[in-house]
Amino acid sequence: MQTYRTEGNYRSADRLSAAELRTAMASHEILQSTALAFDTARQLRFELGGVRAVMPFEQCADGAETGSVRDIAVLTRVGRPTCFVIEELDTDEAGQPCYRLSRAEAQRMCKADYLDALRPGDILPCTVTHIEPFGAFCDVGCGISALLPIDCMSVSRISSPADRVSVGQQILCAI
């Protein structure tokens, strides 16, 4: 069974062998790598085990194919760990091998197998990704965001969520 984590906490695909990558592809294992670029074809570029990999825009986040994800949300993945499943091994226009990746599929798997099964009172590990005056946005698994409202952070009055949490901090949250 797949264990779902926040982005940055999956097995890195950067130095895996071709055989290990094929095994991960066959089992739909969620891996991660740092996105190297967002190109003019609107796809994220990676390198896995010395082989080029691309993630088409529609596969960069669940909802991207319907237009509910903006380019800036994908562009901000560059230089950061990004989780995905390997969809296929294809060849590019030059005849070189190229992996096709999907973060959207990893997110759909996380929702269906993990998040949708949570009940009130369940505790889940989160990573704070962004702080606003009204609360903190947290990665609850595979880059899926959830809001932790300011009034749920403290029993005493605080002026800012930054009084209790910081970006990158790993916390436990109750549903």
Task: Indicate where each model-derived feature is located.
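Single-stranded RNA-binding regions, centering on S1/OB-family and related RNA-binding modules
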Residues: 1-174
